[in-house]
Amino acid sequence: MTTTLQQRSGASSWQAFCEWVTSTNNRLYVGWFGVLMIPTLLAATICFVIAFVAAPPVDIDGIREPVAGSLIYGNNIISGAVVPSSNAIGLHFYPIWEAASLDEWLYNGGPFQLVVFHFLIGIYAYMGREWELSYRLGMRPWICVAYSAPVAAASAVFLVYPFGQGSFSDAMPLGISGTFNYMLVFQAEHNILMHPFHMLGVAGVFGGSLFSAMHGSLVTSSLVRETTESESQNYGYKFGQEEETYNIVAAHGYFGRLIFQYASFNNSRSLHFFLAAWPVVGIWFTALGVSTMAFNLNGFNFNQSILDGQGRVLNTWADVLNRAGLGMEVMHERNAHNFPLDLAAAESTPVALQAPAIG
């Protein structure tokens, strides 16, 4: 009889836990994806903070030239970063127990893998948690679809790109200047500015910002007056009210006359779908572009493609980008034995577009 009571008690405890996890009455929804998300994001955050502050230098290139990224080794918030794991590790999974000692693990950049893998699992779980909460509330699932754009971008720079290049040392460092360094090297090695998917991403991000500002300013300018001049117009809205808080007809008429009639949406639902879809699709394409360039399917190369009647090169913007890329690549590869192949195997190229007159 005692055993039966204990089993029922255990079953009821598990049932209570399940109900708490899936309850939409909690102040913050947990969900089954949250059970995975919370510990992984906590682990990634704690390790990132400790490594950013106190991690020793990392032999990122695998040539016994450690690079310091933490604050206590002389960096500041701008220059500091969690340095990617060593090129000597390559694509090997490198948890703490794979190293001979903790010092070796730190020297080879083990914290980077710990942070990145837990972070990726955490954001995947966060996306699943968005779907789960939408499902519990009977909503459509498009919130997690929109969030898939930054998830795809993070996966591209932290996972797909290292896979394509053959080493986690080529992943994006976890810091401000490290991000810019990654962007410069990416341009030097893959000519991303001349890749159409990157162009679509730029149109998505900047276009999304423009459309967001246009929509917000139009709505704010066509609010239905519910307050006096001495009150804030925000007091004219009551949460959950049935009537529209702004006049979409007035906004449509204004914008239709400012541009032309069919440039303005007359359907609020299609408008907001467009506002969501534009940046999401753009960022999807950027992530896809990085993922293809990871395997060296690079941007267009129009270098020295325009010649005059005598066969001399007429330098274009493509040539400027190419020469800038060569300079960035030389700075990136700091060692003679690791010199960029496209410089070492080709004829010398003048750096300046026009040599200055001397004397």
Curated annotation (Swiss-Prot):
It catalyses: 2 a plastoquinone + 4 hnu + 2 H2O = 2 a plastoquinol + O2. The keyword Magnesium applies. Its EC number is 1.10.3.9. The record marks H190 as: Stabilizes free radical intermediate. Pheophytin a binds at Y126. Residues 345-359 form a propeptide. Keywords: Calcium, Chlorophyll, Chromophore, Electron transport, Herbicide resistance, Iron, Magnesium, Manganese, Membrane, Metal-binding, Oxidoreductase, Photosynthesis, Photosystem II, Thylakoid, Transmembrane, Transmembrane helix, Transport. Disulfide bonds: none annotated. Chlorophyll a PD1 binds at H198. It is found in: Cellular thylakoid membrane. Tyr-161 forms a radical intermediate that is referred to as redox-active TyrZ, YZ or Y-Z. C-terminally processed by CtpA; processing is essential to allow assembly of the oxygen-evolving complex and thus photosynthetic growth. Chlorophyll a ChlzD1 binds at H118. Belongs to the reaction center PufL/M/PsbA/D family. Cyanobacteria usually contain more than 2 copies of the psbA gene. 2 of the reaction center chlorophylls (ChlD1 and ChlD2) are entirely coordinated by water. HAMAP family: PSII_PsbA_D1 (MF_01379). This is Photosystem II protein D1 1. It comes from Synechococcus sp. (strain CC9605). The gene is psbA1.
